[in-house]
């Protein structure tokens, strides 16, 4: 009953208003406000400050600076196995598997459209049909910067407006098409393993999503926006494996998509498996160059 009431509340709460108010609080620089908030957060969520570059909670200029804190060098070593697909962030696996009949598994009894997740464009979604997906949920205590699982060159970024339901286990089980309904930023890369999509999904209390190349992408612009990065007028944006690509100012979810027969997820990973950025999420099955060579034979 408690879970059902929580799901029902998600439909009636003013999501964007709550998130924008939270964003204002998170940017407050008044010492007594931000220090009280940060210290409560560290204590309540048991945040390990020993791995942060700045260990003293009150040394941050505001809550958002604390929340997107950098870690000490070496805190997240990158798996050096050839062909390893890295976890893009800290968190827990929500789901991972195969994209079947154009749909991505969300929770028992629920799935969502890969095409809708990517902004409703058939051509954009086509390379991922029959491919692989991994959904990683970032809890409040986690490190909230997002990194590249493989090296890639940015081709397109799409801001997709939407609701901002919470994205915990309860709502995943109770809100149909959750991740394809929430506000999100879709980033498409060309990699040696073929096309890769990284989708940063917003949620209630997520005040904003940023990328390293565009800065602030949300709060909402109320309409779908597409930004091309493969045009002659723009300098190519290439990010190396393990490099930061974006961050959440208050938590949420990252969804990775690869094309068919490109990656194999690690067998030991499943729903609720804890993960850290830089660990192996899986292994590349075949490189794009090798695939093209096979097709030419």
Curated annotation (Swiss-Prot):
GO annotation (BP), single: phosphatidylethanolamine biosynthetic process
Main localization (coarse): membrane
Active site annotation, chain numbering: 90 (charge relay system), 147 (charge relay system), 252 (charge relay system), 252 (schiff-base intermediate with substrate)
Keyword field contains ATP-binding: no
UniProt feature coiled coil, ranges: none
TM helices/strands, residue ranges: none
One cellular component (GO) term of this entry: plasma membrane
Cofactor binding notes: Binds 1 pyruvoyl group covalently per subunit.
InterPro entries in the record: PS_Dcarbxylase, PSD-B, PSD_type1_pro
A GO MF label: phosphatidylserine decarboxylase activity
Keywords assigned by UniProt, alphabetized: Cell membrane, Decarboxylase, Lipid biosynthesis, Lipid metabolism, Lyase, Membrane, Phospholipid biosynthesis, Phospholipid metabolism, Pyruvate, Zymogen
Catalyzed chemical reaction(s): a 1,2-diacyl-sn-glycero-3-phospho-L-serine + H(+) = a 1,2-diacyl-sn-glycero-3-phosphoethanolamine + CO2
Modified residues (Pyruvic acid (Ser)): 252
Domain of life: Bacteria
Cofactor list: pyruvate
Post-translational events: Is synthesized initially as an inactive proenzyme. Formation of the active enzyme involves a self-maturation process in which the active site pyruvoyl group is generated from an internal serine residue via an autocatalytic post-translational modification. Two non-identical subunits are generated from the proenzyme in this reaction, and the pyruvate is formed at the N-terminus of the alpha chain, which is derived from the carboxyl end of the proenzyme.
Family: Belongs to the phosphatidylserine decarboxylase family. PSD-B subfamily. Prokaryotic type I sub-subfamily.
Protein name: Phosphatidylserine decarboxylase proenzyme
Lineage: Bacteria, Pseudomonadati, Pseudomonadota, Gammaproteobacteria, Pseudomonadales
